[in-house]
From Swiss-Prot:
It is found in: Cytoplasm. SMART domains: NDK. Keywords: ATP-binding, Cytoplasm, Kinase, Magnesium, Metal-binding, Nucleotide metabolism, Nucleotide-binding, Phosphoprotein, Transferase. Its EC number is 2.7.4.6. InterPro entries: NDK-like_dom, NDK-like_dom_sf, Nucleoside_diP_kinase. It comes from Burkholderia cenocepacia (strain HI2424). CDD domains: NDPk_I. This is Nucleoside diphosphate kinase. Belongs to the NDK family. It comes from the Bacteria. GO terms for molecular function: ATP binding; metal ion binding; nucleoside diphosphate kinase activity. Disulfide bonds: none annotated.
Length: 141
């Protein structure tokens, strides 16, 4: 499997629960390296731009409101099959349907406050990484 990079966001609900370190441990335990990270409090404009693909969906306003409700932790993960590996670690979008031991099963409260975001494909990952790390201050190690 190829070395890939993927974008991960620890959402406001998980940041508020003080579980960033526990989530990072899961990434690293699965063989993923954190090659860039920063904490941010997204502006409405940034959240709307980042989630623009969902603009026509009925949940868009609530998603944006949630994502600007508190700080988020944004990171780039790197490793073999990083995109799929991260999605497996996250679990199903709805934490009630997520397998036991996944990030969402353990830390998420609802389908809206679901603890984490992860890129769903290589093309999406490239766009999402460039959105949050435009200077490409991402370092392989």
């Amino acid at each position: 499997m190829a070395i890939e990079r993927t974008l991960s966001i620890i959402k406001p609900d998980a940041v508020a629960k003080n579980v960033i370190g526990q989530i990072y441990s899961r990434f690293e335990g699965a063989g993923l390296k954190i090659v860039a990270s920063r904490m941010a409090h997204l502006s409405r404009a940034d959240a709307e731009k980042f989630y623009a693909v969902h603009a026509a969906r009925p949940f868009f306003k609530d998603l944006v409101d949630f994502m600007i409700s508190g700080p988020v932790m944004i990171q780039v993960l790197e490793g073999e099959g990083a995109i799929l590996k991260n999605r497996d670690l996250m679990g199903a979008t709805d934490p009630k349907k997520a397998e036991k031991g996944t990030i969402r099963a353990d830390f998420a409260d609802s389908i809206d406050a679901n603890a984490v975001h992860g890129s769903d494909a290589a093309e999406t990952a490239a766009v999402e990484i460039a959105f949050f790390f435009p200077e490409m201050n991402v370092y392989s190690r």
